[in-house]
């Protein structure tokens, strides 16, 4: 019988391994990306804000109440004049908002007609893509505690909210690909961003600590153990920091944890007082003073008795608090009734009313005592674990002594950096918090305005732009918060800078940051935390100061959406049979029964108690399967703390995993439908808290070794990477810094941007001839990154040739460049508009009498043309050519007209061909957008990199006849130095080149180089041998090398050359965009110092600073230094009066110079830099008298 069961078990395991094969899981992954997309976390959270959060904010906020007169339309009720109503008398009026409605974006034409506004037009007109928020205003009269409805004002505008593209409120929602093309949008534009003043803005997620969750930790080894909780109310946003501190003995201050005082006291730390409050006093206020109650709240283990007895003794001592000296901080905010009360009553009021605001206004003493008791229990358990660490370790190693009681008392310190204790605020949550702050001030502003007018007038509300301007300020500046507020976060709304490729924009949309300064010295927070695996990409983070602070979501990572705690509590209460309310528990019941009870927490708030916590977890899973609860609701049981935590708050990291038990039981999985797998329970979402209590297999190798251990499985191991790192071929065959470098450089790789021809960003770079990579990953294919490539497959030879490719230099084939290899076009947009505020500008062809010394021949000179005075399309413009002719007209007091030429001139960085001109208007002001195209051929100094982070700059461009060649005449496109491979250990580039060579030989268009393939996990070296063997079968050398001839003499090269296709990128760092020098004819000077200007924008040169000066002195070229820093800089001649030793009173006359101070003519001249002369004047202005002594005078 046992053998039969074992055989059945083995058979089931084999069937399971067959069911969850890599092929099936990749099929599931493909459907997930097609249905969910990569910006789901942005779109869903914003939709939740629009359809739920705005209504919640308005319902939770107090109504507008003021003394005044009714609106004029409310004087008649039910067709008759209301009895006793006097229109001249003021009444107590209340205005309530309901039926919130957010319209779709619209725009008003010049003839006042309204039509839909689309994103392309918003970009073109440089306006914000936003929509109106309307409410119905109910007007009540408060009389004798009765609310009398006297009027109802429909569709009153209260704000304009920026709308996220492709969200449910966007006009592009549910549009077909063809319709989006007709509306000027790209087919693959994912949305998830905003358009503010014509610029695209992305809200960057903000990582923070979780609210309403206690964390026990020790800051430093010598500091006391603390248990912190930031309690925040869902309704009001009011928060309080509750901190419990275990007072260690003086021995513990010497960093000897094994000798901690076992009778240490516990204090409550709050911001309202600087002096700690004994926990015994807090329990006394909460009417917990007996040992039985404390055992029920904290625990009945013998190890905790000494602490409980001490608390009871202190609680029964009435003078323990009276003898303390309480210092209330200046930030105290108690009401007027308690200002004359004693300090003891103030603390008592805080404990009874303000402590744990997330429990609600109606929370009882019992609920607060339970929550406080659980925090005390956690604190004591961690303390006992620290004291008895060796004993617990010894018991853990001894199988015979491993008892349940030992496990119950073992609880280590918690990690604040653990992702189960973190929340990320995405677009919807950020808008929710900002709108709530603005709405509170909006209500106060309306009350003030209505009281001034002394009447209900809807234009006061509809014309109040407080919310609109506040939202516009935050979105346009990136400073998130209400102006003149202490708490404003910077850099939340950002303009995507690296929009040079398709994948780089997705990376921006999936970014989140830790809001701390880049100069922060905390290195631990920058390190990769084990709990972040499959949530945050371990490779995609910038180098330098922002390392570990700017992060990106992994491929399957999502963010939970808030579900009200009240709804969750009602469902749990109705569905769980062992549920008990707090008030139903009596201490007279069986103590054994009480010891089995576990507290149910919903988002940190107390829901009830249960004697069957495991059954509750099962009930929650069934409710999720029946769609009674959302898929992102999580439930975990912590036996050491006797707590069940059900989480439905927003911002939790969640991801889908395979439910092995469901797959075993049901089978017949539809792997091509992610939604079907989710509905049938084959796929479940888990957050970081649930994952800590789960056994998840990463691949089939883990599952086959321990099939009975794992309850879940990852969909694919490569999903631990982010958008950019997941595109790197064979990412597991290179060192981790290379993945980080490539994730950053791939964002700078110039590619083909969707719909770039209809957008007019400030600078857009597009590669002319892009190619799909021969070797790529499954994730890149599934998300269609290869449909918009950012490089090409170059034939690369790895060899030392001429010496010009040393130190990461690259030799390029000139003939390949002539055929279009790596050609890039840079589009620069110049915006010119007619200014009407303060000046009177007009775009036209300036008359000859007012023109400057510029070229006006390229302008349209037909007055009937709508482009009169604007440069013609397809014209080649260069420096000092006029792009747009503009004239400023001023009328003097005597009536004469004076015209001044104010035309827009081409600068040195804007030379090129006029690609297109867009004529539009913004708020009635004429505007032209001129797009100039610049052709960028590869040249010496330009930067390139492979898809495996082998970067380099062009060191030489060789003629094709000088390049090495093979026997069949094949010539490489580029030559790289072989020393770059062993030093950087980029084995994946060698593998990708071999696979690409095989693909070319077999006429295959796709070589699968996905990381962590099942076939290469057991023995990675077998994968390399298999690639080489396959190449050999195609007729090439096993190791990928080729015999090549020298390009100069045709002789055979001694060494065989590794030769094959490698996917290469051209980066945005180009010499033509950075090189600059100052012309000798440039006479531009600084207005104050009279020194030449430096910098490319000022047409200046490199500034000679202090260090440059020292280097030139070392080289012995002091004459050159004198010439550059004096003769050609700010040379100045000073006339000095020798007797007065000053030059301030020397004046020039017809007969020469004389001193007006002493009437003398003993004047000498000396050379001096004008900056020094300016310094002398500043010293004189500060009251310092300067005297100049002349030698031999």
From Swiss-Prot:
Belongs to the RNA polymerase beta chain family. The keyword Kinase does not apply. Mg(2+) binds at residue 808. A zinc finger (C4-type) spans 1137-1158. GO terms for biological process: DNA-templated transcription. CDD domains: RNA_pol_B_RPB2. Keywords: DNA-directed RNA polymerase, Magnesium, Metal-binding, Nucleotidyltransferase, Transcription, Transferase, Zinc, Zinc-finger. Zn(2+) binds at residues 1137, 1140, 1155, 1158. The keyword Ion transport does not apply. This is Probable DNA-directed RNA polymerase II subunit RPB2 homolog. Transmembrane segments: none annotated. GO terms for cellular component: DNA-directed RNA polymerase complex. GO terms for molecular function: DNA binding; DNA-directed RNA polymerase activity; ribonucleoside binding; zinc ion binding. Component of the DNA-dependent RNA polymerase that catalyzes the transcription of DNA into RNA using the four ribonucleoside triphosphates as substrates. Second largest component of RNA polymerase II which synthesizes mRNA precursors and many functional non-coding RNAs. Proposed to contribute to the polymerase catalytic activity and forms the polymerase active center together with the largest subunit. Its EC number is 2.7.7.6. It catalyses: RNA(n) + a ribonucleoside 5'-triphosphate = RNA(n+1) + diphosphate. The lineage of its organism: Viruses, Varidnaviria, Bamfordvirae, Nucleocytoviricota, Megaviricetes.
């Amino acid at each position: 019988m046992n053998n039969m069961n074992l055989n059945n078990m083995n058979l089931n395991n084999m069937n399971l391994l067959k069911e969850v094969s890599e092929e099936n899981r990749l099929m599931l992954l493909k459907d997930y990306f097609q249905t969910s997309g990569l910006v789901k976390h942005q779109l869903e959270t914003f939709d939740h804000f629009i359809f739920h959060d705005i209504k919640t904010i308005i319902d939770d906020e107090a109504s507008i109440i003021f003394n005044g007169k009714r609106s004029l339309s409310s004087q008649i009720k039910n067709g008759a004049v209301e009895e006793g109503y006097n229109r001249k008398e003021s009444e107590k009026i209340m205005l309530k908002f309901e039926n919130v409605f957010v319209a779709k974006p619209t725009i008003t034409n010049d003839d006042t007609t309204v039509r839909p506004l689309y994103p392309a037009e918003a970009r073109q007109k440089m306006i914000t893509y936003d929509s109106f928020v309307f409410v119905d205003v109910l007007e009540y009269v408060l009389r004798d505690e009765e609310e009398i409805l006297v009027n109802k004002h429909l569709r009153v505008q209260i704000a304009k909210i920026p709308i996220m593209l492709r969200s449910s409120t966007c006009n592009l929602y549910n549009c077909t690909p063809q319709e989006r093309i007709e509306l000027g949008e790209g087919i693959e534009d994912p949305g998830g961003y905003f358009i503010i003043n014509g610029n695209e803005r992305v809200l960057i997620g903000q990582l923070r600590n979780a609210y309403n969750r206690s964390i026990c930790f020790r800051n430093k080894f010598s500091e006391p153990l603390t248990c912190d909780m930031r309690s925040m109310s869902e309704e009001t946003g009011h928060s309080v920091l509750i901190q419990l501190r275990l007072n260690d003995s003086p021995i513990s201050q010497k960093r000897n944890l094994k000798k901690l005082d076992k009778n240490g006291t516990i204090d409550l730390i709050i911001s309202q007082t600087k002096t700690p409050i004994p926990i015994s006093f807090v329990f006394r206020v909460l009417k917990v003073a007996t040992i039985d109650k404390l055992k029920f709240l904290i625990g009945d283990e013998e190890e905790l008795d000494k602490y409980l007895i001490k608390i009871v003794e202190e609680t029964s001592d009435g003078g323990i608090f009276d003898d303390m000296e309480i210092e209330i901080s200046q930030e105290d905010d108690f009401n007027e009734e308690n200002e004359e009360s004693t300090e003891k009553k103030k603390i008592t009021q805080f404990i009874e009313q303000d402590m744990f605001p997330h429990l609600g206004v109606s929370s009882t003493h019992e609920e607060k005592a339970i929550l406080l008791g659980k925090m005390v229990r956690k604190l004591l358990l961690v303390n006992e674990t620290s004291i008895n660490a060796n004993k617990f370790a010894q018991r853990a190693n001894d199988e015979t002594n491993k008892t349940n009681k030992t496990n119950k008392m073992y609880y280590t310190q918690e990690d604040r950096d653990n992702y189960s204790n973190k929340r990320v605020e995405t677009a919807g949550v950020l808008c929710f918090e900002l709108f709530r702050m603005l709405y509170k001030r909006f209500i106060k502003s309306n009350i003030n305005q209505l009281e001034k007018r002394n009447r209900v007038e809807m234009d006061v509300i509809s014309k109040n732009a407080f919310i609109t301007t506040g939202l516009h300020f935050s979105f346009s500046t990136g400073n998130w918060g209400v102006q003149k507020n202490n708490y404003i976060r910077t850099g939340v709304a950002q303009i995507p800078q690296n929009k040079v490729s398709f994948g780089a924009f997705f990376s921006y949309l999936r970014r989140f940051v830790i809001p701390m300064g880049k100069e922060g010295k905390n290195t631990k927070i920058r390190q990769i935390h084990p709990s972040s695996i499959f949530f945050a990409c371990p490779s995609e983070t910038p180098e330098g100061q922002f390392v570990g602070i700017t992060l990106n979501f992994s491929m399957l990572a999502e963010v939970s959406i808030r579900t009200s705690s009240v709804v969750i509590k009602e469902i749990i209460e109705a569905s769980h049979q062992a549920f008990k309310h707090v008030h139903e528990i009596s201490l007279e019941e069986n103590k054994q029964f009480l010891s089995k009870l576990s507290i149910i927490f919903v988002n940190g708030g107390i829901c009830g108690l249960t004697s069957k916590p495991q059954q509750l977890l099962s009930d929650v899973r069934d409710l999720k399967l029946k769609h009674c609860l959302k898929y992102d609701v999580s439930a975990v049981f912590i036996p050491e703390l006797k707590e069940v935590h059900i989480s439905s708050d927003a911002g939790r990291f969640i991801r889908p995993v395979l439910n092995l038990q469901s797959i075993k039981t049901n089978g017949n999985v539809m792997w091509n439908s992610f939604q079907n797998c989710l509905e049938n329970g084959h796929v479940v979402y888990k957050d970081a808290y649930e994952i800590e209590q789960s056994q998840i297999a990463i691949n089939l190798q883990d599952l086959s070794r321990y099939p009975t251990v794992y309850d879940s499985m990852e969909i694919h191991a490569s999903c631990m990477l982010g958008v950019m790192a997941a595109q790197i071929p064979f990412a597991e065959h290179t060192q981790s810094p290379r993945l980080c470098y490539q994730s950053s450089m791939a964002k700078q790789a110039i590619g083909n941007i969707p719909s770039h021809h209809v957008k007019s960003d400030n600078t857009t770079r597009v590669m002319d001839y892009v190619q799909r990579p021969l070797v790529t990953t499954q994730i890149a294919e599934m998300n269609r990154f290869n449909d918009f490539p950012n490089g090409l497959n170059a034939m690369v030879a790895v060899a030392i040739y001429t010496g010009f490719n040393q130190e990461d230099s690259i030799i390029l084939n000139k003939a390949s460049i002539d055929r279009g290899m790596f050609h890039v076009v840079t589009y620069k947009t110049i915006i010119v508009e007619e200014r009407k505020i303060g000046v009177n500008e007009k775009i036209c062809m300036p008359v000859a009498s007012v023109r400057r010394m510029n070229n006006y021949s390229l302008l349209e000179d037909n007055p009937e043309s709508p482009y009169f005075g604007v440069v013609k399309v397809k014209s080649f413009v260069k420096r000092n050519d006029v792009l747009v002719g503009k004239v400023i007209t001023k009328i003097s007091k005597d009536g004469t007209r004076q015209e001044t030429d104010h035309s827009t001139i081409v600068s040195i960085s804007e030379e090129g061909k006029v690609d297109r001109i867009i004529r539009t208007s913004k708020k009635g002001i004429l505007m032209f957008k001129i797009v100039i195209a610049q052709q960028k051929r590869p040249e010496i100094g330009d930067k390139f990199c492979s898809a495996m982070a082998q970067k380099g700059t062009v060191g030489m461009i060789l003629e094709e006849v000088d390049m090495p060649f093979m026997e069949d005449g094949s010539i490489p496109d580029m030559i790289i130095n072989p020393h770059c491979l062993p030093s950087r250990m980029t084995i994946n580039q060698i593998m990708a080149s071999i696979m690409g060579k095989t693909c070319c030989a077999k006429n295959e268009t796709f070589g699968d180089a996905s990381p962590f393939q099942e076939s290469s996990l057991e023995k990675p070296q077998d994968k390399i041998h298999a690639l080489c063997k396959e190449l050999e079968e195609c007729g090439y050398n096993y190791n990928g090398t080729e015999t090549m001839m020298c390009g100069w003499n045709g002789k055979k090269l001694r060494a065989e050359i590794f030769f094959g296709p490698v996917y290469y990128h051209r980066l945005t760092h180009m010499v033509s965009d950075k090189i600059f020098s100052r012309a000798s004819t440039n006479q531009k000077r600084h207005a104050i110092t009279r020194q030449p200007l430096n910098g490319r924008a000022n047409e200046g040169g490199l500034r000679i600073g202090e260090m440059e000066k020292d280097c030139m002195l070392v080289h012995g070229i002091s004459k050159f230094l004198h010439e550059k820093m004096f003769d050609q800089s700010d040379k100045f001649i000073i006339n000095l009066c020798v007797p007065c030793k000053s030059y301030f009173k020397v004046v020039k006359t017809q007969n020469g110079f004389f001193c007006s101070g002493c009437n003398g003519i003993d004047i000498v001249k000396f050379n001096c830099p004008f900056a020094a002369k300016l310094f002398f004047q500043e010293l004189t202005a500060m009251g310092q008298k300067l005297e100049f002594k002349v030698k031999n005078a």
